[in-house]
A protein has these predicted regions:
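P-loop NTPase motor domains
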Residues: 1-13, 17-188
Length: 188
């Protein structure tokens, strides 16, 4: 069905997303067709990064939530002000490692309030060269919000404690964005 829709829409719709060793699932949470980041998009990015950073049974402290929010907002400001910067997780990681580190040092944020080195260490597997560097650094400029038919095949990752929660969050974000943004369009 996906192939049929994909062919009939000349590649515009009928998106089939699955995980295979030689063709793993890849997204870019920092990409939007419009280049705009509303509150909902910002919150979904924060939730995604928080899921990567903290275990299910490990609640973030308020100071950590504030620091993460500051990092995401500052990075989004950077990529929206400078269109030459390619938005992706690698760029976010480098921004936190270099620029945001300086910003929180200037603000005198204590390490016990936000351990930036621990944060970067936990996120390193998703950064360039890490085990999951493919997952959040897709070079395809694909915003799923405007796609009319998408199939996510999860069988191959159903037992993966790293991939499944991330892919599930991206599916949820896509669904919620479609429900809220696409006014007057029938959704099924």
């Amino acid at each position: 069905l996906c192939s049929l829709i994909h062919d009939r829409t000349h590649g515009e719709d009928g998106i089939y997303i699955t995980y295979e060793e030689d063709n793993p699932i890849a997204f870019n949470p920092f990409y939007t067709d419009s280049g705009e980041f509303d509150v909902e998009k910002r919150e979904s990015i924060k939730t995604l990064i928080l899921t990567l950073w903290k275990r299910e049974d490990e609640a973030p402290r308020r100071s950590e939530e504030v620091a993460l929010s500051g990092a995401v907002n500052a990075y989004i400001r950077r990529i929206t002000e400078n269109r030459d910067v390619r938005p992706d997780f690698n760029g976010f990681y480098e921004f936190v490692r270099d620029d945001y580190r300086r910003m929180i040092e200037e603000k005198k944020v204590r390490e016990k309030d936000f351990d930036i080195d621990g944060f970067l260490n936990v996120l390193e597997p998703f950064y360039r060269g890490g085990d999951y560097d493919f997952l959040l650094n897709s070079d395809k400029e694909l915003d799923l919000t405007n796609k009319r038919f998408i199939v996510f095949e999860l069988d191959n990752i159903s037992g993966n404690k790293v991939l499944l929660p991330v892919v599930t969050l991206i599916i949820m974000e896509t669904f919620i964005a479609k429900m809220r943004r696409l006014k007057g369009i029938r959704k099924m």
